Amino acid sequence: MESDVIADLRCKLKETEEERRKAAQYGLQLVESQNELQNQLDKCRNEMMTLTESYEQEKYTLQREVELKSRMLESLSSECETIKQQQKMHLEQLEETLSRSHGQEVNELKKKLETLKAELDEARLSEKQLKHKVDHQEKLLSSKSKEMQMSERVHESVSSETLTLQIELTEMENVKTTLQEEVNELQYRQEQLELLNANLMRQVDRLKGEKEEREKEAVSYYDALEKARVVNQDLQVQLDQALQQALDPNSKGNSLFAEVEDRRAAMERQLISMKVKYQSLKKQNAFNREQMQRMKVQIATLLQMKGSQAEFEQQERLLAMLEQKNGEIKHLLGEIRNLEKFKSLYESMESKPSANSVALEDDTYYTDLLQIKLDNLNKESESIKGELSIQRMKALLESQRALDIERKLFLNERHLQLSQSENMKLRAKLDELKLKYEPEEKIEVPVLKKRREVLPVDISTPNGVCAPSAVGEEDYRLSPQKEEAQSCSDGSEDNNLQLEKTVSVSTSGVILSPYKSLTLDIQPRKEKKCVKLTGVPADLEALSERSRNTPNSPRLAAESRLQREVKQGKETASKLEKAACKKSYPTVYVSSKSTPETQCPQQ
């Protein structure tokens, strides 16, 4: 039997080995085919890039020709515009001169017209005054002639007193007439002064208008002078530049310009090739983004499927609990039936002694004692049954509470999964919007910082002692990294992640200087740790970590707590050991570059 079992196991082992070999061969074939496809893709991409570069070069040459023709057209159009501007300037100057001459003539004619108006007003006023004087003199003459006639008539018939009074009256009338003439003269003088004042006011208004016009002309002259100065300065600068170019000995030859033109053409070709490469890389990046978007959508759908699977598991668990409770109920019903049978038997047994009580009056004392004990036992059994029922009720309450808590936990887990799926969908939508509205992102190149290691120099140890200590320190430093890598590999088994961990440790060499035999120039080991996760992008890795960190049940929560406590204990222990290892030694800074002879790769 054992030999048959061993033979079967050996056959199974051979079959598994053959299957593994076949799987390895298929994997190698797939890898080779993938490499061939990648090489073909690279070749096609290079061909496309060369073709695009040639097309871009042709496009650039055509653009240059078009630019030259456009420049020629622009130069011709600029010449036409300059001629038009010159003609416009000439016309504007002619218009300005004609307007000025016309304004001057109009002003002269206005002056003459005003002078003629003033003379006409003066002549009219003098004529009016003279007419008024003539009328007044005629009235005086008529009144005097009448008075003379009256005086001659009265002189003959009137006495001397009346004559004196008449003489005085005539004198007073003469005085009155003289005063009246003076008043008229003053009125005439006032009218002349008013006319003169009006003429002067007109002249003042006219002079103000002329002053404003002269000020405007002065402002226009000043603006034209400033423009002429600016134009003169520009022309002077152009003249100075032309003189400097004429005096510059380097500008006389064409070799420098040809070299500059060649360099410019080479740089433009390089720029075109870089643009083509940039466009191809941009398209590749967009394709990778689309793939990432699809993966995120698939992860969201998987999360939704996981939520539905959790519902099915919960339903199965509830059905199992229901079956268990039904079995318990059946068992309790059977016990109740047995107890009813026992009770019926006990009642029948009690009825029989009651019927035969007359015959058994002379029973012994032991029967009474047993009866008392039986009664006590019945009472105790009843009390125990009551306590048992109370405990059963308590157990039912606790089970009900546990069921309620499990329901709440399940609802919370379902809400969590739904929120995770919605979060993934929102992230996918956000990435789509970013791709639409923010297609170009600024890529920040990470700056590599050089590390400087601190080595003790006071203790002079030989090479054989230094090397093991350094190796021990490096192993100690590598141990937490190995633990983290193991934890990552254990956690990412579901996603089929391949963890590649390369650690290159460069051995340190000790060189003694020829002049100082005591000082040691020690080159420390440089640790290069790089952990690469192939097959899954960073977003999927973060999502897998989140999905691992989300507790799906109390058992998983307890396990995660235990893992955290263990990790914290390990971290504290490593910190304490590092603090104990660190001592106050004088530091020396050594270059972190390692030679190819001293490198020792480890995996």
Swiss-Prot record:
It is found in: Cytoplasm, Cytoskeleton, Microtubule organizing center, Centrosome; Chromosome, Centromere, Kinetochore; Nucleus; Cytoplasm, Cytoskeleton, Spindle pole. Keywords: Acetylation, Cell cycle, Cell division, Centromere, Chromosome, Coiled coil, Cytoplasm, Cytoskeleton, Kinetochore, Mitosis, Nucleus, Phosphoprotein, Ubl conjugation. GO terms for cellular component: centrosome; cytoplasm; nucleus; outer kinetochore; spindle pole. Residues 561-577 have a biased composition (Basic and acidic residues). Monoubiquitinated with'Lys-48' linkage. Deubiquitinated by USP45. HAMAP family: SPDLY. Interacts with KNTC1 and ZW10. These interactions appear weak and may be transient or indirect. Interacts with dynein intermediate chain and dynactin (DCTN1). Interacts with the catalytically active form of USP45. Belongs to the Spindly family. This is Protein Spindly. The gene is SPDL1.
